[in-house]
């Protein structure tokens, strides 16, 4: 389930009521992120929640680290409570489940599509894949709501929160009402990365499945 957050995705935790054009400041922060941040690294916490408002209940929490280089190169590593790795080299997405010692390979173009991963790790053609709408400001974080234009996606909305030009969080809700909140900390923008930083090596003895 966890890897679906990136490769097939979800949508907004907050059901934004306002449908006006997005605030210029929030839009500028989003555009600045997708065009100005060519690479980054940091840490994330991922929470699965149910309910809304005061009735929100956390049903699961995981955390880990990430690093990416646009377009299409990234490492998304879960470290708690279980280890799992999602890594892409620009052409292929590799999903490694340590407990099963199993690697799943997917063509990257089909795996990203109009997903949250496309926003974080893809190119900067957001207008091609999403409709951007205004969201609220909560605790100093300005939110945008992105709705995929494609009809065959597995999610409804993606909420993106920025503060002082930094990506703070993503709120995701899928078509089945499942909700995921991603929060980001310690993000370093445009750090130097080794040429082979995203080269995937199949772990010894691992089974490989191609999709």
Curated annotation (Swiss-Prot):
Compartments reported by the entry? Periplasm
Q: Name one Pfam family in it.
A: LolA
Gene Ontology terms describing biological process: lipoprotein localization to outer membrane; lipoprotein transport
Q: Does the keyword Signal apply?
A: yes
GO cellular component terms, alphabetically, are: outer membrane-bounded periplasmic space
Superkingdom of this protein's organism: Bacteria
Q: What is its main location?
A: periplasm
Signal peptide annotation: 1-24
| UniProt keywords, alphabetically | Chaperone, Periplasm, Protein transport, Signal, Transport
SUPFAM superfamilies xrefs:
Prokaryotic lipoproteins and lipoprotein localization factors (SSF89392)
Q: Which InterPro entries match?
A: LolA/LolB/LppX, OM_lipoprot_carrier_LolA-like, OM_lipoprot_carrier_LolA_Pbac
The job of this chain, per UniProt, is described as:
Participates in the translocation of lipoproteins from the inner membrane to the outer membrane. Only forms a complex with a lipoprotein if the residue after the N-terminal Cys is not an aspartate (The Asp acts as a targeting signal to indicate that the lipoprotein should stay in the inner membrane).
Q: How does it assemble?
A: Monomer.
UniProt-listed NCBIfam families: lolA (TIGR00547), PRK00031.1-3 (NF000661)
Similarity field? Belongs to the LolA family.
What is the official name of this protein in its record?
Outer-membrane lipoprotein carrier protein
Lineage runs: Bacteria, Pseudomonadati, Pseudomonadota, Betaproteobacteria, Burkholderiales
């Amino acid at each position: 389930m966890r890897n679906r957050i990136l490769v097939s995705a979800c949508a907004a935790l907050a059901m934004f009521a306002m449908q006006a054009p997005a605030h210029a400041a929030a839009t500028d922060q989003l555009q600045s992120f997708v065009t100005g941040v060519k690479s980054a690294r940091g840490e994330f916490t991922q929470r699965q929640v149910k309910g809304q408002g005061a009735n929100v209940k956390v049903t699961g929490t995981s955390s880990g680290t990430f690093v990416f280089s646009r377009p299409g190169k990234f490492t998304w590593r879960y470290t708690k409570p279980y280890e799992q790795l999602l890594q892409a080299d620009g052409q292929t997405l590799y999903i490694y489940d340590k407990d099963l010692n199993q690697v799943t390979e997917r063509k990257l173009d089909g795996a990203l599509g109009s997903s949250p991963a496309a926003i974080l790790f893809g190119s900067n053609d957001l207008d091609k894949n999403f409709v951007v709408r205004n969201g609220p400001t909560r605790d100093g974080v300005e939110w945008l709501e992105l709705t995929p234009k494609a009809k065959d996606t597995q999610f409804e909305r993606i909420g993106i929160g920025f503060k002082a030009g930094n990506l703070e969080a993503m709120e995701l809700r899928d078509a089945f009402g499942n909700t995921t909140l991603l929060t980001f900390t310690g993000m370093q923008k445009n750090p130097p990365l080794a040429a082979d930083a995203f080269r995937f090596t199949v772990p010894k003895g691992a089974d490989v499945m191609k999709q």
